[in-house]
């Protein structure tokens, strides 16, 4: 499994409303700096006063002049829950997904005195947890 597989699975299974930064971890921990500063700032803005973003017009394939249909031109979101969503993956074992609110993520990053978050720590910080081991859809 790769991060793109997690992205596809998340799209099928997620029932929670909000904005999400997805992270995929095959190790015992994931670095806090895997969430870039601009991503963190955007997630905090969405939970707060708002974030405006224009969706770019991009070709579906390189060197092609036609474009993928986009749902709309832009959005302005405010007061929306924002999460870092981490899947801790181990081959042929349970695949746990943790929804950590962005403010909890920032607090944990600043308070724990280490550079990464373990699965046990993520479980303690998560607002929601899901098991993606079994195949399933919405």
Residue ranges and their predicted role:
Residues 1-13:
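Nuclease catalytic cores
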Residues 47-104:
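Nucleic-acid nuclease catalytic cores
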Residues 110-138:
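Charged phosphate-binding loop/patch that engages nucleotide di/tri-phosphates or the phosphate backbone
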Residues 17, 38, 77-79:
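Short connector loops at helix/strand junctions that flank enzyme active sites
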Residues 24-52:
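Mg2+/Mn2+-dependent nuclease catalytic core
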Residues 33, 68-69, 102-112, 116:
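Sequence/structural signature of beta-propeller domains
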Residues 12, 17-27:
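Conserved catalytic cores of phosphodiester-cleaving nucleases, focusing on short active-site segments
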């Amino acid at each position: 499994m790769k991060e793109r597989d997690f992205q596809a699975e998340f799209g099928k299974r997620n029932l929670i409303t909000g904005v999400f930064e997805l992270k995929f971890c095959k190790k015992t921990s994931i670095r806090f700096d895997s969430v870039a500063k601009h991503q963190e700032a955007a997630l905090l803005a969405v939970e707060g006063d708002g974030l405006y973003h224009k969706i770019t017009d991009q070709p579906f394939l390189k060197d092609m002049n036609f474009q993928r249909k986009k749902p709309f031109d832009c959005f302005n979101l405010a007061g929306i829950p924002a999460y870092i969503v981490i899947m801790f993956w181990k081959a042929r074992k349970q695949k746990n997904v943790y929804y950590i609110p962005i403010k909890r993520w920032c607090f944990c990053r600043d308070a724990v005195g280490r550079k990464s978050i373990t699965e046990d720590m993520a479980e303690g910080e998560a607002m929601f947890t899901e098991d993606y081991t079994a195949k399933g859809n919405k």
